A protein has these predicted regions:
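Residue-level detector of alpha-helix initiation sites
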Residues: 14, 18-19, 44, 117-119, ...
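Glycine-rich dinucleotide-binding loop and its adjacent helix/turn
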Residues: 115-173
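Short hydrophobic core segments
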Residues: 14-15, 106-116, 157, 238-248, ...
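FAD-site-proximal beta/loop scaffold in flavoenzymes
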Residues: 128-151, 223-226, 236-313
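Beta1-alpha1 glycine-rich phosphate/pyrophosphate-binding loop at the start
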Residues: 2-81, 169-191, 387
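C-terminal catalytic lobe of FAD-dependent flavoproteins
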Residues: 9, 228, 236-265, 338-416
Length: 416
C-alpha cells in the first residue's frame, strides 16, 4: 500500500526497507533527527526480518506478523513515511532526484541506498519454471508453501547457508531432498573444510542426498511449464517436484552505478558509508567496503549485523556525529538442532584449531592468520562465540596449545 503522505521531497530518502534501510530510519529518529524521512521498499509488505524466511517462516513455525521488524503503525507514529511497492528506475545525483518505475519523481537532501540484492538465478533452460524458486522475499516463500503439498522430491541448488537451512526444513517435513553444490564442499565460501565436512555428515545422516561438484545443465519441463527433472552436466537426470535456488545475490545497484557511483559487485563506500556521489550513502548487502577483519579487502557482507551496523554509521554521519565502520562481523545459522554462530572472517587463515569434539555436536573451530585469532565457527557452543568475539576485536594472539584445550574457557587462554 502507498502511504497517504503525498510528499515528493524528503530531507533523507532511504531506498530499501529491509534490515539496513529500516534501521537507518530508526537510528535517525533515535538520534533526534527532525527532518522528513522517506522509507521506500519495493515489496508490498512492511519491513520484516529476512533470516526466518529459510527457517521458521518456511517451516510454518512463525506467522508473518511475528517476523515484522516493527508493528505496522510504528513508522507513521515516528514520522517516517513508509511507502511499499516503490521501485527506483533512475537517480539524478546533481538534481538530487530519483525516478520511480511508475514515473514519479522524488527529491531528496540525502539519499541512503539500502536496496539489497536480487537472487542469482541459474542461466540454463527451464530455470524460469513455475516450481523453481529462490528464497529471498516473503512472496518467494509464500509460493513455495503453496506448492509444498504437491511436492515430495525437492532439488536444492547451492550448498550455502540458505540451501542447507532449507534442506533441514524440508527434511523435517518428510520431503526427499537433494542438494547440488558446484564446489567440492558445502559452505565453501564461508567456512573451513572441517566445518563443511561436519555439516555434510549431519545432513546425510538426516537423509539429505548431497552431491558435490555437481551442476545443472538444464531443467526438463512438462506441458504445464513445470520442472520435472534436473539434468546435470554429468548427464544424470534427477526427477523433481520443486527446485530451490540458493546461489547468492546480485546487488541492486544499477541506478546508482548508472548515475556515476563507483562500484561493480556492489556500490563502493568509504568507512563512513559514503559513495562517490555527494550526499549519497550505501549500506547493507549492496555496499562494498574495505573491511578491517578481511585484512583490508574490499568485500560485501550479507548479514543482519552488517546491515544494522552500517545503518548506524550512515545515520550518525547525517546527524553530524561521524564514526567509522569497524564492527566485527558475525553470522548465525540454525539447522536441525545445531546452532552455528560465526564471529570474524576466516578468509586467508593459515591455521585452524579444533576446540571440543564434533562427535558430541558441540565444538568450535578457531581460525588464525600469522598467529592472530581472526574467526571462530561455534557449533552449539555459545560461550566460545561470546568470549571469542572480544579476542577477535582485540586482534589477540592466543597460545595455540591452550586454545586447543576445550576445558579452558577462551577468557582463560593465555595470549602471546
Amino acid at each position: 500500500m502507498e502511504s497517504e503522505n503525498s510528499s515528493e521531497q524528503y530531507d533523507v530518502l532511504i531506498v530499501g526497507a529491509g534490515h539496513a534501510g529500516a534501521q537507518a530510519a530508526i537510528n535517525l529518529r533515535q538520534g533526534k533527527f527532525e527532518g522528513t524521512i522517506g522509507l521506500f521498499g519495493d515489496e508490498r509488505a512492511h519491513p520484516y526480518e529476512r533470516p526466518p524466511l529459510s527457517k521458521e517462516y518456511l517451516a510454518g513455525d512463525k506467522p508473518f506478523e511475528r517476523i515484522l521488524l516493527r508493528p505496522e503503525d510504528f513508522w507513521g507514529e515516528r514520522g517516517i513515511d513508509f511507502q511499499s511497492g516503490a521501485r527506483v528506475a533512475s537517480v539524478d545525483p546533481l538534481a538530487k532526484t530519483l525516478r520511480l518505475a511508475n514515473d514519479r519523481e522524488v527529491a531528496f537532501g540525502k539519499l541512503i541506498w539500502a536496496a539489497g540484492g536480487s537472487p542469482r538465478m541459474l542461466p540454463c533452460p527451464g530455470a524460469g519454471a513455475a516450481n523453481i524458486h529462490a528464497i529471498r522475499r516473503k512472496r518467494d516463500v509464500d509460493l513455495i508453501r503453496e506448492q509444498l503439498d504437491e511436492a515430495q522430491r525437492i532439488v536444492i541448488v547451492g550448498g550455502g547457508y540458505i540451501g542447507l537451512e532449507a534442506a533441514a526444513v524440508m527434511r523435517k517435513m518428510g520431503k526427499q531432498v537433494t542438494v547440488l553444490e558446484a564446489l567440492d564442499r558445502v559452505l565453501a565460501r564461508v567456512a573451513g573444510p572441517q566445518l563443511s565436512r561436519f555439516y555434510e555428515g549431519e545432513h546425510r545422516a538426516q537423509g539429505v542426498d548431497i552431491r558435490l561438484e555437481s551442476m545443472v545443465e538444464l531443467f526438463e519441463t512438462d506441458e504445464r511449464g513445470r520442472a520435472v527433472a534436473a539434468v546435470l552436466t554429468s548427464g544424470e537426470s534427477l526427477p523433481m517436484d520443486m527446485g530451490l535456488i540458493g546461489i547468492g545475490i546480485v546487488p541492486e545497484v544499477g541506478p546508482l552505478v548508472s548515475a556515476g557511483a563507483a562500484g561493480g559487485n556492489g556500490v563502493d563506500i568509504d568507512s563512513q558509508c559514503r559513495t562517490s556521489l555527494p550526499d549519497v550513502y550505501a549500506i547493507g548487502d549492496c555496499a562494498a567496503h574495505g573491511n578491517p577483519y578481511a585484512d583490508g579487502a574490499h568485500i560485501r557482507l550479507e548479514s543482519v549485523q552488517n546491515a544494522n551496523d552500517m545503518a548506524r554509521v550512515a545515520a550518525m554521519h547525517i546527524l553530524g556525529k561521524p564514526m567509522d565502520y569497524d564492527a566485527v562481523p558475525w553470522f548465525w545459522s540454525n539447522q536441525y538442532d545445531l546452532k552455528l554462530q560465526t564471529v570474524g572472517l576466516s578468509t586467508g587463515f593459515d591455521d585452524c584449531v579444533l576446540r571440543g569434539d564434533p562427535a558430541e555436536r558441540s565444538f568450535s573451530l578457531a581460525y588464525l592468520r600469522d598467529g592472530q585469532l581472526i574467526a571462530l565457527d561455534c557449533v552449539n557452543k555459545t560461550k566460545d562465540y561470546a568470549q571469542g568475539r572480544a579476542l577477535i576485536t582485540a586482534k589477540a594472539h592466543p597460545d595455540r596449545e591452550q586454545l586447543a584445550d576445550a576445558d579452558l574457557t577462551l577468557k582463560e587462554v593465555a595470549l602471546v
